[in-house]
Amino acid sequence: NNQLNASHK
């Protein structure tokens, strides 16, 4: 989940 968010940023 966190990895997906980091990609969005």
UniProtKB/Swiss-Prot annotation:
Domain of life: Eukaryota
The name this protein goes by in its record: Unknown protein 5
